[in-house]
Amino acid sequence: LKQNFSISLPQAMREEVGYAVKQVSDEEHKELSPQWVYEIFEENYVNNTPYFTVESCHFKQNDGIMAETEINFGGKKTIVDANGNGRLDAVSNTFKQFFGISYELSTYEEHALSHGSSSKAIAYVGITCDGKNYWGVGMDEDIIKASIHALIVAVNKLPQIAQNESAQDERLTSMLNYIQNNYQDVTLESIAAQFHLSEP
């Protein structure tokens, strides 16, 4: 991958990618061409978002960075807000909030794929959940977009996402967004009025 496509995998990711390639090689009973190796890599780590995608993502300064992420899951689009230390952390927190999951951002690496003003960047994101690593890769001229795509692929691999046919109740997500957007003056009474709940 490095020699033919300038892809320099993080050390911690190499064994898993090698295993995926070896599995195909063993099944086909032959050595794979560089292009075939790249296609296996792309299928497993770049174009692999079977459960959810992100339609859009916007950021603003708010006690760090706030991400407004539009998540497309099960054919439904939901906007989720969350804060983080940086853009990737903020987007990661929208996923944790929406799906009700927990994981750690364990590895982040990036490098240019080619030289020049219009060169693409590649980002590698590794997350850890229950002691196991999950990897995703993104490529884009915008390194932030590449990073977010890599995170989306990694989170799609979590077993909890596959099992989670319906995400948390949309009404709960709406309440969390309302509280976050009005955190300075939110009260139980205002939440009750906004969401037609019985008075506390």
Task: Label every PLM stretch briefly.
Residues 2-162:
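Terminal or standalone catalytic/regulatory effector modules within metabolic enzymes
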Residues 185, 189-200:
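Basic/polar phosphate-binding segments, predominantly the helix-turn-helix DNA-binding elements
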